[in-house]
A protein has these predicted regions:
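Conserved acetyl-CoA-binding loop-helix of GNAT-fold acetyltransferases
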Residues: 55-68
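Short beta-strand micro-motifs in enzyme catalytic cores
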Residues: 16-20, 42-45
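Polar/charged side chains located within well-ordered beta-strands of beta-rich proteins
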Residues: 9, 19, 32, 63-66, ...
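A short, internal acetyl-CoA/4′-phosphopantetheine-binding micro-motif in the GNAT/acyltransferase core
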Residues: 47-55
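Conserved GNAT acetyl-CoA-binding A-motif
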Residues: 70-82
């Protein structure tokens, strides 16, 4: 992945939605979401990378960041994609 791309976690204490964005030179070039549900379930939601920044490993970095977050904080929970 390009070293100038930064993955940033946007934390929300009010909602169960977790968001990560990919930034390049201060611009958002991608995002990925997940929803923390009741009964120890996590729903993987939308993921997107701007077409000008595809094929640089950004989607993979977003996906792995989200997955590692789940493994660290929600081990044993059911994770599914929608």
């Amino acid at each position: 992945m390009n070293e100038d791309i930064k993955i940033v976690h946007l934390k929300s204490k009010q909602q169960r939605l977790q968001t990560w964005i990919a930034m390049f030179n201060g611009e958002i070039v991608g995002h990925i979401y997940m929803d923390i549900e009741d009964e120890q379930r996590i729903k993987f939601l939308d993921a997107w990378v701007h077409e000008d920044y595809r094929r640089r490993g950004i989607f993979r970095a977003l996906w792995e960041t989200r997955w590692n977050f789940c493994k660290k904080y929600y081990e044993g929970w059911l994770v599914y994609a929608w």
